[in-house]
Swiss-Prot record:
Its main location: cytoplasm. Belongs to the tubulin family. SUPFAM superfamilies: Tubulin C-terminal domain-like (SSF55307), Tubulin nucleotide-binding domain-like (SSF52490). The MREI motif is common among all beta-tubulin isoforms and may be critical for tubulin autoregulation. This is Tubulin beta-5 chain. The modification 5-glutamyl polyglutamate is found at residue 438. Tubulin is the major constituent of microtubules, a cylinder consisting of laterally associated linear protofilaments composed of alpha- and beta-tubulin heterodimers. Microtubules grow by the addition of GTP-tubulin dimers to the microtubule end, where a stabilizing cap forms. Below the cap, tubulin dimers are in GDP-bound state, owing to GTPase activity of alpha-tubulin. Some glutamate residues at the C-terminus are polyglycylated, resulting in polyglycine chains on the gamma-carboxyl group. Glycylation is mainly limited to tubulin incorporated into axonemes (cilia and flagella) whereas glutamylation is prevalent in neuronal cells, centrioles, axonemes, and the mitotic spindle. Both modifications can coexist on the same protein on adjacent residues, and lowering polyglycylation levels increases polyglutamylation, and reciprocally. The precise function of polyglycylation is still unclear. Keywords: Cytoplasm, Cytoskeleton, GTP-binding, Isopeptide bond, Magnesium, Metal-binding, Microtubule, Nucleotide-binding. One of its GO terms (biological process) is microtubule cytoskeleton organization. It comes from Gallus gallus (Chicken). The keyword NAD does not apply. Pfam families: Tubulin, Tubulin_C.
Length: 446
């Protein structure tokens, strides 16, 4: 019932994805060989959301692993959970995309995409009632961004009524891995705006800050960063996998979180995050979780929610707790910080409560915010994009793969439109709307 097919593309996507499967397997009591070693019937009750049970009682992830070079795949296969995945579901090319979006989207990736879709189709046929897809990828590289967005649009064609959910690692403001990141990211956002239902914006820099400031890790590794991401990913789908007092699924989240179809870029957060040494000094209570969850330092995207306003928020609480207390806290935070919530969506916090906490915690919570402050992230990418595009720097790598400059111009203006849409709704009030919105509709229709 309600299965989710997971796809990971590119190096970043595969590393986050693999970490995610470690976390999920741990929650469901699945060992690295796919056997069940858990201790509670609840772990197996809805295990088929993410796992397929083979004839030999082995649980196999509904995961498709995609990359244009064999390197990352090999390290996944030789990693601790490498034997968990179905060998046929590793699909890789030999050439690599070389951080080039055009290679991932038009040339190398396009050659591989049909064999990926075959595997995706096979996974979907094993499903009883497919809920949707989740993709992990980064927007800075070539494969995750170029081929990832190609996969999204192909899957969208074939399964138009299923939810498409992406966990996208955005380029960071200060840390840049590749020079052409702004190009790749802008071209990807151009696709994500049209083709996904929910996109969780994750940012390495924000994750570094959390590891450094909050978790007090002096030298955070990618493993630590990916662990944070996978905690959030596990939180988002927790009510599909475990019974709860108030359930949410991907579609409910989308319906409650997306007021306008293009504005589906969310900031995730997770609580409790405490340094290893100071854990025993903190009481885990609902107020404490709520406090930390709405804290700007806790956001996994490098945007400050205090610079914008929340259109909508979803929170998933995990662990034994009283619903009444959760509701009171949510009401309190909306009343106390009412200026940070748009007033034209009255009750804009969606709550889900699940009874089973993550491993090793008494209670935890996941935060998903649709805030207009996310425009900072797009503005940043857009400025870097314009600076390079004005001089046509590095363009020959993309045009050489058959792309047209026009496509860059379109992507740029689409991203700028997105920024101004966020800005427009940030400034909108409950009663000024009548004339203002009529003008906007005309503009959009042109």
């Amino acid at each position: 019932m309600r299965e989710i097919v997971h796809i990971q593309a590119g190096q970043c996507g595969n590393q986050i994805g693999t970490k995610f499967w470690e976390v999920i397997s741990d929650e469901h009591g699945i060992d690295p060989a796919g056997g069940y070693v858990g201790d509670s019937a609840l772990q197996l009750e809805r295990i088929n959301v993410y796992y397929n049970e083979s004839s030999s009682q082995k649980y196999v992830p509904r995961a498709v692993l995609v990359d244009l070079e064999p390197g990352t795949m090999d390290s996944v296969r030789s990693g601790p959970f490498g034997q968990l995945f179905r060998p046929d579901n590793f699909i890789f090319g030999q050439t690599g995309a070389g951080n080039n979006w055009a290679k991932g989207h038009y040339t190398e990736g396009a050659e591989l995409v049909d064999s990926v879709l075959d595997v995706v189709r096979k996974e979907c046929e094993h499903c009883d009632c497919l809920q949707g897809f989740q993709l992990t990828h980064s927007l800075g590289g070539g494969t995750g961004s170029g081929m990832g967005t190609l996969l999204i649009s192909k899957i969208r064609e074939e399964y138009p009524d299923r939810i498409m959910n992406t966990f996208s690692v955005m380029p960071s403001p200060k840390v840049s891995d590749t020079v052409v990141e702004p190009y790749n990211a802008t071209l990807s956002v151009h696709q994500l705006v049209e083709n996904t239902d929910e996109t969780y914006c994750i940012d390495n820099e924000a994750l570094y800050d959390i590891c450094f400031r909050t978790l007090k890790l002096t030298t955070p590794t990618y493993g630590d960063l990916n662990h944070l991401v996978s905690a959030t990913m596990s939180g988002v789908t927790t009510s599909l996998r475990f019974p709860g007092q108030l359930n949410a699924d991907l579609r409910k989240l989308a319906v409650n979180m997306v007021p306008f179809p293009r504005l589906h870029f969310f900031m995730p957060g997770f609580a409790p995050l405490t340094a290893r040494g100071s854990q025993q000094y903190r009481a885990l209570t609902v107020p404490e979780l709520t406090q930390q969850m709405f804290d700007a330092k806790n956001m996994m995207a490098a945007c400050d929610p205090r610079h914008g306003r929340y259109l909508t928020v979803a929170t998933v609480f995990r662990g034994p707790m009283s619903m009444k207390e959760v509701d009171e806290q949510m009401l309190a935070i909306q009343n106390k910080n009412s200026s940070y919530f748009v007033e034209w969506i009255p009750n804009n916090v969606k709550v889900a409560v699940c009874d089973i906490p993550p491993r090793g915690l008494k209670m935890a919570s996941t935060f998903i915010g649709n805030s207009t402050a996310i425009q900072e992230l797009f503005k940043r990418i857009s400025e870097q994009f314009s600076a390079m595009f004005r001089r046509k720097a590095f363009l020959h790598w993309f045009t050489g793969e058959g792309m047209d400059e026009m496509e860059f111009t379109e992507a740029e203006s689409n991203m700028n439109d997105l920024v101004s849409e966020y800005q427009q709704y940030q400034e909108a009030t409950a009663n000024d709307g009548e004339e203002a919105f009529e003008d906007d509709e005309e503009e959009i229709n042109e």
